[in-house]
Amino acid sequence: MGRRYFGTDGIRGKVGDAPITPDFVLRLGYAAGKVLASAPGRAASGARPTVLIGKDTRVSGYMLEAALEAGFSAAGVDVMLAGPMPTPGVAYLTRALRLSAGVVISASHNPYHDNGIKFFSADGNKLPDEIEAEIEAWLDKPLDCAASDGLGKARRLDDAAGRYIEFCKSTFPAAFDLRGMKLVVDCAHGAAYQVAPHVFHELGADVIPIGVAPNGFNINDGVGATAPDALMRAVRANHADLGIALDGDADRLLVVDHTGRLYNGDELLYVLVKDRIATNGQVEGAVGTLMTNFAVEVALKEAGVQFVRAAVGDRYVLEQLRERGWQLGAEGSGHILSLDRHSTGDGIVSALLVLAALKRSGKTLAQMLEGVTLFPQKLINVRMKPGADWKGSEAIRRAIDSAEQALSGSGRVLIRASGTEPVLRVMVEARQATDANRHAEAIADAVKQATA
């Protein structure tokens, strides 16, 4: 059964345009509620399902929360409201409170005018494709509201923030604290604005918070992981030891060192793997994506660590980790997974893992990454006619083969079609930027000529 609305990270779009409308979200809540109520063992036990709803700081979150709550209530499902809460916080609380499911109202790193809905199962994992398909099937059925005595009830979870703060702190080694460290924490005017500064402060750090004044319209606007320049300036201006950049729903992390240098998810993955090797003796493998920088793959293999590339998207990184029984994976954008700490990517927990690695090693980030220099990447988006057969073009194949032969193990070529528009993405990595640029442009020219 296919899916019409769910993508790789829930349902997302511009508020007011289908499907991110109040009427659709109400029906979505009802449909999800009916699926939860019919889950194996649920009907037999007679227990009423309970879901947790969290959101980020977008002005539309209040409207969509009310619609979602109404839909669940109509399906006979109880609701707990967490208020503004990072996506990984909802995943944790759903699992810790033994709830039926968790729901996050957020569009993550997107601008304020977008929003979305994503679900977590009772164990804090994203819903399987087949459950999302079941929910979509219920969207086509009439909304048959429960009788008055069967309506779901709603209440606020008053201690949600405190519970999540304590969970985050519990992932940091008891032998360490952050006393003597000055940290700039950028919360992107998003879901972590109330919790992230407290986590680091309660562990002893001198915290300088930025991006903690949400007004409903400024989430991710010039701050956070998608706009790290503000953090880089703040770290230098305040002579801080480290800067921590989260995105709107706090499932991503980028880090800035004391010099103002930015470190992405690829580099942080390498740091965490090296820390695990130092503490545990070995790491069997790690997972990146098709976009992970080639230099990180080379460095991990030199350290004796297997490296696997998943499709782009933390959902696919998670799938590969589970399939292999590994713990560490990441995307360059800052989604970092450490499955022995959390079931999903968590920007705050990932920052604590990095800080623990620095404490254990006594090194700076630059020192831990010594010898690992990211390869320059050249990305060219080539527009094509819809349906153009670029895979069957001999000219494109020759251009790709020529680049791969020239790079000969010192770089790589990645060609992939966009899933949302008629664009072919041509990416080349090489040790020298001039080589990456030259080969990418040659392939892009071949694509343009072959698909004109």
Curated annotation (Swiss-Prot):
Its EC number is 5.4.2.10. SUPFAM superfamilies: Phosphoglucomutase, C-terminal domain, Phosphoglucomutase, first 3 domains. The modification Phosphoserine is found at residue 108. It catalyses: alpha-D-glucosamine 1-phosphate = D-glucosamine 6-phosphate. It comes from the Bacteria. The keyword Phosphoprotein applies. InterPro entries: A-D-PHexomutase_a/b/a-I (IPR005844), A-D-PHexomutase_a/b/a-I/II/III (IPR016055), A-D-PHexomutase_a/b/a-II (IPR005845), A-D-PHexomutase_a/b/a-III (IPR005846), A-D-PHexomutase_C (IPR005843), A-D-PHexomutase_C_sf (IPR036900), A-D-PHexomutase_CS (IPR016066), Alpha-D-phosphohexomutase_SF (IPR005841). One of its GO terms (biological process) is carbohydrate metabolic process. Binds 1 Mg(2+) ion per subunit. The active site is at 108 (phosphoserine intermediate). Mg(2+) binds at residues 108, 247, 249, 251. Keywords: Isomerase, Magnesium, Metal-binding, Phosphoprotein. Gene3D superfamilies: Alpha-D-Glucose-1,6-Bisphosphate, subunit A, domain 3, Alpha-D-phosphohexomutase, C-terminal domain. GO terms for molecular function: magnesium ion binding; phosphoglucosamine mutase activity; phosphomannomutase activity. Disulfide bonds: none annotated. Activated by phosphorylation. PANTHER family: PHOSPHOGLUCOMUTASE (ALPHA-D-GLUCOSE-1,6-BISPHOSPHATE-DEPENDENT) (PTHR42946:SF1), PHOSPHOHEXOSE MUTASE (PTHR42946). Belongs to the phosphohexose mutase family. Catalyzes the conversion of glucosamine-6-phosphate to glucosamine-1-phosphate. This is Phosphoglucosamine mutase. It comes from Burkholderia mallei (strain ATCC 23344). The gene is glmM.
